[in-house]
Design a protein with these regions (language model features):
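Binuclear metal-dependent hydrolase catalytic cores
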Residues: 1-84, 90, 173-204
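Cap/insert and terminal regions of metallo-dependent hydrolase folds
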Residues: 73, 79-84, 90-193
């Protein structure tokens, strides 16, 4: 609730300007408010339903992004199709359980070998604060090897990598840092996500 209220407050003026500029017919005011859905994630590896409407079911399960607490992933079900969002996390048994046979698994990915190399360079150059951050972030994200193994064991039909670290600066880096190492472990359809990407899953 706190986060949603913060976003609403931050965008309140922006929304009023858009409505004033385009008119209520184009920008209906009732579309503006975001309503938080409060829930307590299960303490174990189970999932709970947090949304159910018009055939869409959204479930949530606990993941591990300590010290961020709670941290969750999501399983979205519609017309027999399943999309799973890993959330920010290391690999957990709950992820495996709720990603099984997903039509699409969207999972964060970090190439810790490359991040570690960047950390070392920063330390050698005397950038201790930056080096410390690069060291710290490795303990609460999934390495590319974890992601590939998870998707393969879960039998996910498609895997889309997101929240990439380090951010690739070219298609070659995207392949070298992410696609290639994940593909060594995952045999399904693999996508390296980018802003604006749309993935269509046909339903019956």
């Amino acid at each position: 609730t706190q986060i949603v209220e913060g976003f609403r407050s931050a965008y309140e003026l922006e929304e009023s300007y858009r409505i004033a500029h385009h008119g209520e017919e184009i920008m209906p005011p009732e579309w503006s408010p975001s309503e938080p859905i409060e829930f307590v994630p299960p303490a174990d590896d189970s999932a709970i339903v947090i949304y159910e409407k018009d055939g869409v079911t959204v479930k949530t399960f606990r993941v591990n992004h300590a010290p961020v607490e709670p941290s969750v992933g999501y399983r979205i079900e519609y017309a027999g199709k399943v999309v799973v969002l890993s959330g920010d996390t290391i690999r957990t048994t709950s992820q495996l359980e709720h990603s099984r046979n997903a039509d699409l698994l969207v999972a964060e990915a970090m190439n810790k070998e490359v991040v570690g190399a960047i950390e070392d360079i920063n330390r050698e150059l005397g950038y201790e604060d930056q080096a410390t951050i690069l060291f710290d972030i490795q303990d609460y994200h999934m390495d590319v090897s974890d992601v590939g193994a998870l998707a393969e064991e879960a039998n996910a039909k498609q895997l889309a990598l997101n929240h990439l670290a380090p951010k690739p600066q070219s298609g070659r880096q995207a392949n070298l840092f992410f696609r290639d190492p994940v593909a060594e472990l995952y045999s399904g359809q693999l996508l390296v996500g980018k802003d604006g990407m749309q993935i269509v899953i046909p339903v019956p």
